[in-house]
Every structure is written in structure tokens, then in C-alpha cells.
């Protein structure tokens, strides 16, 4: 096979390659055997037309598309491998010369991985705003949050306050006309929770049981029900009950209720402190990793980032996110409905930092190459086992989905990140 490469721009070029008759003829034979099965030609049984008759009647050219589709992927990959190119996007293939008895010549417009010139990536000095210290106030705050979760709602006399729950009947109308979904009975609403549209809950503060309040609001411009968006509405609201939260006493009994592994409040606080310390340790390490990677990228020189790489990263991130949702039993449609967003909103979210993610990955790959990182069979098997456990999959499923080369790449990347972060020094 003849192969050549012409550089047309930074990280772009054209690969010209030929496919020889040793590959073409078997592919034509295979294409003929596939096509003839469905051919009805007078004088021959279905599927038994001789090759010579087929060529005379239809022409060998009728087989070219099927034959080319069969051999093109391997021929293209062989050409790329021979040239040692690292292609990062789908090529644009063009047939230049194809005919009977001759080698076929094709071109492929390709986008190649940009060159990365590494700067300093070890012993980096970084600053992080995350502290590993756990204060008494943080322990008390966690305890108070857990205590509030055990609060009971008790009917109270007097005016409703923020944090109270009101049980209400309501009927909404726009220009005096009731609308679908604007009516409810015995609905429990915590004031200040933000469950209802802005301004609704505020107007019930101060109301008492038995009061009837005309709540006047305006639907947000981006309200999910487009027929109501931006419109003024009135909700005639009757307050049936006002309930206040009654939290349990802060004592050893509370500690036992919150955690059956402790007997006293002091033991519970000690346990919470350890949990907070562990969480802060992880947050601190993540912050150091992020800062070190950012600095390593800043120190590196990347020659023109191809737009295709950024676009591929957006697609990859979105697909990964959607896959994680579906593993939790949440369909894309359900997610967009719950969040009030669209696929375009999600795309914009991932586009925002896709450029940074691509550059970071390129630098990590360059570090892995510079350090000569590889993966042993034992490391690959451990990675498979870890992924199977993380995603609740069978080990065999993970092995089928991920090739050894993909796993080696991921392991080398992890080693490179470890080299960058483990040597980093926090200012």
C-alpha cells in the first residue's frame, strides 16, 4: 500500500493511500456473493447467476460500493498507523481513483492531535482556599441540621412565620379566569422553601388559621407553562392550619435516635467530626489536584487546539452524563422536565469549560508519555474490577465494553495525575 501525508494547516492534513488488488479482489468476491443471493435473472435460479454473466449484465462497478465499505476501515487505519498519525476526529474520505484491474486511490482529510510542549509539572506551588480544619461550629451545624430533620410539625395558634408550614386551599386565576393546575386543597407549604413561584409564600407570612388571603403574583418569564409565563395571577388562598416545627431536645436520647452506634451526645459529635474531617480531606485533595493541573496546563504550550476536539469533548461529557442518569433510572426527558431545562441548556453548560478539559487531558497524556507510564496485567484487571463495582456491572461486561488499550490509557492518565499532584506543594 502506498501512503503519503500532506500537511495543509496546523494540526490538519490530507492522507493519500492506495488499496491494492490483493485486498480489492476478495472484497469484490464477498460483495458478489452477498448481492447474488437476491438476484432473479432469467435463465438462472435465484442466487445462482455466474460472475461473468453478472459483470456483463450489471458491470463490476455495481460491486464497488459494497467492496469499498468492507475494506475501507482497515485500509484507512493501516495508513494512519504507517504514518504514525494521532487522529482526533472523524476523517473526510474522498475516492480519487477507482476502476477495474487497478489499485484504488483515496484521500482522507484528517485532524491530528496538537503538539504539547510541557513546562514544569512537578513540585508545583499551589494555593487552595479549602481548609482541612473542622471547627466546633461546623460540628454543631451538622448536628443541628440532623436534629431539624427529626422535627415534628405541631399545630400552632397565632401568625405564620418563615419556617412554619401552612396547610392551604387555593384557586388561581388570570384576568379572572381559572387555569389548569392552579387549584389545590389541603396543600402543605413550608414558608420560605421556595416551592411556589416568587412572592407567593411571602404573602402568607402573618396569616392565621381560618384567614383568606388574596395572593397576587406574576409568573416568571421563563415559567415552564408558556401560556402563563409573564402573566399576573391572583390566588384566593384559605389557610386551614399553621404548623410549627418542634425539634427534639439536644441530649443523649437525640444522639441515640440519630445514630444507633453511639450512646451519648459527645460520642455523636466525635463521630460527626471524623466524618467532616474525611470529607474535608477529600475536598482539600481535590482542590490541590485541580490547582496543580491548572498550573501544569498554564506552564505547557499547546499548538492550536482543533475545534473538533472541543466538540468531541462536549458530546462525550453529555453522553456520560446521560448514561449516568439512565443507570439511575432517569430518562433524558424526565431529567429535562424535572429541571425545567433543555438539551441545548445542557450543551451550553458543557461547552463552557470544554476547552479547558481538552487542554488538561492533552497535558496529562503528555506527562504520561514523558514519564513512560504503562499498565501491568494486574493493574488492568484491578481497573476492570473497580469499574464493575462502581457501576454495578459484571466484570465480564466491563471487559467487553473497554479494550485493554483503553484501560491502559486510563491507568497511565491516573499515574500522570498522581505525579503532578503528589509532588505539589501548598503555599
Curated annotation (Swiss-Prot):
Involved in protein export. Acts as a chaperone by maintaining the newly synthesized protein in an open conformation. Functions as a peptidyl-prolyl cis-trans isomerase. It comes from Streptococcus thermophilus (strain ATCC BAA-491 / LMD-9). GO terms for molecular function: peptidyl-prolyl cis-trans isomerase activity; protein folding chaperone; ribosome binding. The keyword Lipid biosynthesis does not apply. Residues 163-248 form the PPIase FKBP-type domain. SUPFAM superfamilies: FKBP-like (SSF54534), Triger factor/SurA peptide-binding domain-like (SSF109998), Trigger factor ribosome-binding domain (SSF102735). Consists of 3 domains; the N-terminus binds the ribosome, the middle domain has PPIase activity, while the C-terminus has intrinsic chaperone activity on its own. Its EC number is 5.2.1.8. Keywords: Cell cycle, Cell division, Chaperone, Cytoplasm, Isomerase, Rotamase. Belongs to the FKBP-type PPIase family. Tig subfamily. It catalyses: [protein]-peptidylproline (omega=180) = [protein]-peptidylproline (omega=0). One of its GO terms (cellular component) is cytoplasm. GO terms for biological process: 'de novo' cotranslational protein folding; cell division; chaperone-mediated protein folding; protein transport; protein unfolding. The keyword Cell cycle applies. PROSITE patterns: FKBP_PPIASE. It is found in: Cytoplasm. Its main location: cytoplasm. This is Trigger factor.
Amino acid at each position: 500500500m502506498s501512503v503519503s501525508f500532506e500537511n495543509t494547516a496546523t494540526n490538519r492534513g490530507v492522507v493519500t493511500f492506495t488499496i491494492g488488488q490483493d485486498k480489492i479482489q476478495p472484497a469484490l468476491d464477498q460483495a458478489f456473493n452477498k448481492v447474488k443471493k437476491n438476484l432473479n435473472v432469467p435463465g438462472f435460479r435465484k442466487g445462482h447467476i455466474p460472475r461473468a454473466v453478472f459483470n456483463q449484465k450489471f458491470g463490476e462497478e455495481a460491486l464497488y460500493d459494497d467492496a469499498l465499505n468492507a475494506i475501507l476501515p482497515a485500509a484507512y487505519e493501516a495508513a494512519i498507523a504507517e504514518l504514525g498519525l494521532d487522529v482526533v476526529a472523524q476523517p473526510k474520505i474522498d475516492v480519487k481513483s477507482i476502476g477495474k484491474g487497478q489499485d484504488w486511490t483515496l484521500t482522507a482529510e484528517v485532524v491530528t492531535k496538537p503538539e504539547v510542549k510541557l513546562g514544569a509539572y512537578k513540585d508545583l506551588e499551589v494555593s487552595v482556599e479549602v481548609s482541612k480544619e473542622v471547627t466546633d461550629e461546623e460540628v454543631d451545624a451538622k448536628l443541628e441540621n440532623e436534629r431539624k430533620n427529626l422535627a415534628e410539625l405541631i399545630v400552632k395558634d397565632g401568625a405564620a412565620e418563615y419556617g412554619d408550614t401552612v396547610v392551604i386551599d387555593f384557586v388561581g386565576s388570570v384576568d379572572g379566569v381559572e387555569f389548569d393546575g392552579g387549584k389545590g386543597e389541603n396543600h402543605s407549604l413550608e414558608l420560605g422553601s421556595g416551592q411556589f413561584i416568587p412572592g407567593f409564600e411571602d404573602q402568607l407570612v402573618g396569616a392565621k388559621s381560618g384567614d383568606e388571603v388574596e395572593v397576587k403574583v406574576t409568573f416568571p418569564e421563563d415559567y415552564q407553562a408558556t401560556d402563563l409565563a409573564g402573566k399576573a395571577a391572583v390566588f384566593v388562598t384559605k389557610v386551614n392550619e399553621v404548623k410549627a416545627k418542634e425539634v427534639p431536645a439536644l441530649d443523649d436520647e437525640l444522639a441515640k435516635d440519630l445514630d444507633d452506634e453511639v450512646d451519648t451526645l459527645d460520642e455523636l459529635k466525635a463521630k460527626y467530626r471524623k466524618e467532616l474531617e474525611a470529607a474535608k480531606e477529600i475536598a482539600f485533595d481535590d482542590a490541590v489536584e485541580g490547582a496543580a493541573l491548572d498550573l501544569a496546563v498554564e506552564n505547557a504550550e499547546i499548538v492550536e487546539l482543533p475545534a473538533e476536539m472541543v466538540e468531541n469533548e462536549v458530546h462525550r461529557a453529555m453522553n456520560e452524563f446521560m448514561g449516568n442518569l439512565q443507570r439511575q433510572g432517569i430518562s433524558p426527558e424526565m431529567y429535562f422536565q424535572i429541571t425545567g431545562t433543555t438539551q441545548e441548556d445542557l450543551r451550553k453548560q458543557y461547552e463552557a469549560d470544554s476547552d479547558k478539559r481538552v487542554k488538561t487531558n492533552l497535558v496529562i497524556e503528555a506527562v504520561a508519555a514523558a514519564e513512560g507510564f504503562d499498565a501491568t496485567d494486574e493493574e488492568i484487571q484491578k481497573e476492570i474490577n473497580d469499574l464493575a463495582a462502581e457501576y454495578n456491572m459484571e466484570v465480564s461486561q466491563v471487559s467487553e465494553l473497554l479494550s485493554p488499550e483503553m484501560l491502559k490509557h486510563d491507568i497511565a492518565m491516573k499515574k500522570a495525575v498522581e505525579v503532578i499532584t503528589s509532588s505539589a506543594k501548598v503555599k
